[in-house]
Amino acid sequence: MGVRAQQKERTRRSLVEAAFSQLSAERSFASLSLREVAREAGIAPTSFYRHFRDVDELGLTMVDESGLMLRQLMRQARQRIAKGGSVIRTSVSTFMEFIGNNPNAFRLLLRERSGTSAAFRAAVAREIQHFIAELADYLELENHMPRAFTEAQAEAMVTIVFSAGAEALDVSPEQRGQLEERLVLQLRMISKGAYYWYRREQEKMAQNSDK
């Protein structure tokens, strides 16, 4: 990559980080202005268009980055699990670390999931589906269950995880710890339920085949 290309990439990165830094519990992406983001990134507003067509393209890039960041962290968690440790507890701890270290990235996913922009809703839905699919892959490999079962289990788990994440955004460390324990319990209940449901279905199939 040439010097100019590197500089352009650094500036683009600065714009993304500037936009993330301006999000908060009180401020959504929709309230950001191009001028504010450009000023925070240290460039002229007109220079913004060298990197993004408009503010919406910047926002969609942020959604993609947030989803990718979360999936990469969860992949790392699964690598830690492979070396020994509780699957659910390690995954929940990793997720809560993501919330603590990247609150605005998670806020963006939560808000735009049900926001007014169809493009943003679709982008967040796509990221969540990636997340569900990767978890379903892992469950299928580890639990030797059919895809239909692991997808249903993964979807239920992700729904509860995102709900807990929303609660964990603006609470004290002590409250976040309590949320983490509750989430571990809920996910274990889903996991056990999925396992016994699958066993029951297998038993039914075996009984029917014997008739």
From Swiss-Prot:
Protein name: HTH-type transcriptional repressor FabR
GO molecular function, one term: DNA-binding transcription factor activity
GO biological process: fatty acid biosynthetic process; negative regulation of fatty acid biosynthetic process
Quaternary structure and partners: Homodimer.
Signal peptide: none
Organism: Cronobacter sakazakii (strain ATCC BAA-894)
HAMAP family, per database record: HTH_type_FabR
Intracellular or extracellular location(s): Cytoplasm
Function field: Represses the transcription of fabB, involved in unsaturated fatty acid (UFA) biosynthesis. By controlling UFA production, FabR directly influences the physical properties of the membrane bilayer.
Span of domain HTH tetR-type: 10-70
GO cellular component: cytoplasm
Domain of life: Bacteria
Cited NCBIfam families: PRK11202.1
Keyword set includes DNA-binding: yes
DNA-binding region listed in the record: 33-52
Keywords: Cytoplasm, DNA-binding, Fatty acid biosynthesis, Fatty acid metabolism, Lipid biosynthesis, Lipid metabolism, Repressor, Transcription, Transcription regulation
